[in-house]
Amino acid sequence: MDIKLKDFEGPLDLLLHLVSQYKVDIYEVPIVEVIEQYLNYIETLQVMKLEVAGDYMLMASQLMLIKSRRLLPKVVEHIEEDLEQDLLEKIEEYSRFKAVSQALAKQHDQRAKWYSKPKQELIFEDAILQEDKTVMDLFLAFSNIMAAKRAVLKNNHTVIERDDYKIEDMMASIKQRLEKENVIRLSAIFEECQTLNEVISIFLASLELIKLHVVFVEQLSNFGAIILRKEKK
């Protein structure tokens, strides 16, 4: 199965994206939840046999250290707090840097309008799909579901993995199900899967149907269920 997915600009970009979903001050986010989501994302990339850059793995090891320190006795609480504080300061600094970069890019676009030479078009692979949800938003939500499914399948020793699931067949199956039910939760489909390969194939099929506007997606909250609809609301 050949899969290509645009990555974030770096581990801090991914962390900033995760933190921003909470809509609170950076220093008030539940850091353990953010760490879990980051690790779920990295593990899902590995399961899907996608390349993970070294800086992402380095950050993952640092996050696991912060998480493990939380399990230690309170006598080392100051060490834990120092690590978390350092991480949050880096995210905040990156957030300011990104805001400045975006402002400069906007100014550049405005200046380009004064020249007769057409400016070079920028192409963003992480395109907005529907309801302001991007490919990466769905992938991050999927990685959290994937983590839960891996935990279930890990205890099932009778499952035999197969790798002959066809995306086209999965797309047809989802469309057929929507003809009957009109609305389905993506997690409900995953719960019926017997292997991780089947889960991955269904996710990719869903993503393709969404991109083609054959089905429509919604997520009522940043951490809510992903809903597939036959018709747009």
Swiss-Prot record:
<dbReference type="GO" id="GO:0051301">
    <property type="term" value="P:cell division"/>
</dbReference>
<keyword id="KW-0963">Cytoplasm</keyword>
<dbReference type="InterPro" id="IPR003768">
    <property type="entry name" value="ScpA"/>
</dbReference>
<protein>
    <recommendedName>
        <fullName>Segregation and condensation protein A</fullName>
    </recommendedName>
</protein>
<dbReference type="GO" id="GO:0007059">
    <property type="term" value="P:chromosome segregation"/>
</dbReference>
<comment type="similarity">
    <text>Belongs to the ScpA family.</text>
</comment>
<comment type="subunit">
    <text>Component of a cohesin-like complex composed of ScpA, ScpB and the Smc homodimer, in which ScpA and ScpB bind to the head domain of Smc. The presence of the three proteins is required for the association of the complex with DNA.</text>
</comment>
<dbReference type="GO" id="GO:0006260">
    <property type="term" value="P:DNA replication"/>
</dbReference>
<keyword id="KW-0131">Cell cycle</keyword>
<keyword id="KW-0159">Chromosome partition</keyword>
<dbReference type="GO" id="GO:0005737">
    <property type="term" value="C:cytoplasm"/>
</dbReference>
<dbReference type="Pfam" id="PF02616">
    <property type="entry name" value="SMC_ScpA"/>
</dbReference>
<keyword id="KW-0132">Cell division</keyword>
<comment type="function">
    <text>Participates in chromosomal partition during cell division. May act via the formation of a condensin-like complex containing Smc and ScpB that pull DNA away from mid-cell into both cell halves.</text>
</comment>
